[in-house]
């Protein structure tokens, strides 16, 4: 039986001044989609250039992931930063560590 994972993730911009929380079943694909949309300018991540992964957690069920996303979205920045710091104390951008080359060169080959 195929076991899917569902991810809750938090992105930031280069200066770490904004936080974006999302949910997906394919973490790499979704972050690349945020990156591709950077020139559109209509989404939150495009407007604030939030493509850098600081935090993620996996869930077995989509309902749990969605509930967790909503929970985190309801938090103040300070509480989100506490969660991020527990997971990623150096506040490193995790894109390259998890996905290899970042930003992606050949986006079309990865989608």
What kind of region is each of these model predictions?
Residues 1-40, 46-56, 67-70, 87-90, ...:
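GIY-YIG nuclease catalytic motif and its immediate N-terminal context
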Residues 27-28, 61-63, 77:
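Residues at or immediately preceding the N-termini of alpha-helices
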Residues 70-85:
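Short arginine-rich
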């Amino acid at each position: 039986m195929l076991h899917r994972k569902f991810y809750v993730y938090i992105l930031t911009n280069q200066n770490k001044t904004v936080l974006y929380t999302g949910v997906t079943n394919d973490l790499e694909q979704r972050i690349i989609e945020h990156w591709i949309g950077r020139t559109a300018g209509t989404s939150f991540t495009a407007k604030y250039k939030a493509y850098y992964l600081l935090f993620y957690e996996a869930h077995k069920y989509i309902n749990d992931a969605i509930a967790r996303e909503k929970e985190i979205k309801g938090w103040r920045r300070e509480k989100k930063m506490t969660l991020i710091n527990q997971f990623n104390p150096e506040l490193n951008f995790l894109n390259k560590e998890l996905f290899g080359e970042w930003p992606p060169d050949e986006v079309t080959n990865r989608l």
